[in-house]
Amino acid sequence: MGDDELSEIRKRRMAQLQQQAGDQQAMQEEVERQQRLKSQIQMVLMQVLEPDARERLNTIRLTKPDFASAVEQQLVMLAQSGRLRQKITDAQLKDLLRQLAPAKRDYSITRK
């Protein structure tokens, strides 16, 4: 191996390491952005939900995280648009959940 080959290998390796460092930094920034967004959503939910409604939403999050996220987004939109005049009670949250829940299919099996 000549000096030219070694320097070329070093340059490629250095470029590869710099690329990896840049990727790690971008990934870390994305994680931090998601954490900030999550904390902002939690702050809004604390302002618009009563404790029992918040507890119900947390329970739903354990079983259906996607559905809970959709409900949270809906609540944040309502809060930001100014449509919420008071905190949402557990009964009001139940009504909202019924409206947002996908329609269940009812199957009936008849035997001959």
UniProtKB/Swiss-Prot annotation:
Protein name per its UniProtKB record: DNA-binding protein Mboo_1886
Organism from which the protein derives: Methanoregula boonei (strain DSM 21154 / JCM 14090 / 6A8)
Source superkingdom: Archaea
Transmembrane regions: none
Annotated Pfam families: dsDNA_bind
Protein family (similarity comment): Belongs to the PDCD5 family.
GO cellular component, one term: cytosol
Species lineage: Archaea, Methanobacteriati, Methanobacteriota, Stenosarchaea group, Methanomicrobia
Gene Ontology molecular function: any one: DNA binding
InterPro entries: DNA_bind_arc, PDCD5-like, PDCD5-like_sf
SUPFAM superfamilies with a match to the protein in the record: Double-stranded DNA-binding domain
Keywords of this entry: DNA-binding
Coiled coil start-end: none
